[in-house]
C-alpha cells in the first residue's frame, strides 16, 4: 500500500464519515430448545453471554488498533419462533426478556432474531411469536423483531400480511420505539448484519461474524471530483470507491473472527447512511446531477449506485452477503428528510426506489390514524416488488403523529417527517387472506 492510499484511508475516516457500521455475531440457539420455556430462556441467556462475552471488547480493540470507528456491536440469533415452538407457552415475551438481559450483560447495542418465517403458512410457534411482538418490544430495550411474509419461491402469505398490519398498529400503541425495531420482509436473508432485520439462519454455522460497512460520504466525495463527466466515469468511480470500503470491512471481519475464535461469515455490501450531514445516500444521488432526490431520474441514479457498489464490493471480498445495496431509510438520512420536507419525495416514489435499493420502505413515519389494512397493503406492495424481482424488500413503518409532524427517535434512528398516505381503502383486498402464488419464473428446478 503506497502513501497515497494511506492518506486516502485517513481522509475517508476523518473527513468523509467512513465507519464500520456493525460487527454482528450470529449465534445458533437450536441447542437451547427445551419443552420448559423458563429453562429455554436460561439456556439462551447462558449461550449468548458465553459466546459473545468478548464481542464488544474485541470490537473496541480493533477500532483503536486500526483507527476506524466501529459504531455498533450486535448479536443475531436463530428465529425465536423455532425455539418457542417446543414449549407449551402461549406467548414468548419471557424469551424476548432473556435476549434483552443477555444483550445488556455483554454490552451490545441490539440483538435481533425475535423472528418468524411464515412465507408459506403458520406453524405452531409462528402465530404465538407474532402475537407476542407488541409486548416483547414494549418490555425490552435492545430486542429487534422481524417476520418474513413472502418469498420468490413461495409467494406471499396474505394472512400474515394482514396480521402484521395489525401488529404494527398494536406495537405503536404500546411503546414509542417498538415499531422502529420491527421489520416485515419478503425474501429475508439469513446472514444480515443490520438491524432491525437480522436473524441467524438455520443453515449458518453455530457462531459467525458478519460485518456491515457505511460509506456514503466517501462515495459522494469521490463523485465530486468527476462532476460533469459521463456515466461511464461515474460508474467506475463508485465501483473503485466501493472496493476500498469493502476491503476495510473484510479486514475488520477477519480480525474479529480470529480473535473471537469463530468463523468469518460475510461483508454486507451496503451503503448505510446516518442522520449526520455528509453521511447521506440521498446526497450521493444528487451529486450525480439531480436537483433533489425524488425528481425524475432518481430511480436510475439509484440503480447505477446500487449496481456499482455490488461490483466493487464483490472484487474486494470473497464472502459477501446480507442485504448488499444502498439503504434509503428516511429518518436516518438528512438528504431524504430534506426531500420529504420540500415535497419532492413521496411514498409512491419511495416505493419505486425500493425496486432497486437494498431493502424497502424503511423508517418512514405515517399518520397514526392510518388503518391497519392500509399498512398491510403497503407491506403487500413491497412484498410483491421483492417476490417478482427476486430481491429482499421490507417495511419498517412508524404510525405516529399527524401528517407534517416531525417524529424524533434520536441517535442513529434520526428524525422522520410524517408523510401523506393515500386515503382510499384497501380493507376488502386485505380481508381476503390466503396466499398470492409464487411467480412463474420462480419455478426453476
UniProtKB/Swiss-Prot annotation:
NCBIfam families: PRK05313.1. Belongs to the UPF0210 family. Homodimer. This is UPF0210 protein SPP_0289. It comes from Streptococcus pneumoniae (strain P1031). Pfam families: DUF711. CDD domains: RNR_PFL_like_DUF711. Gene3D superfamilies: 3.20.70.20. It comes from the Bacteria.
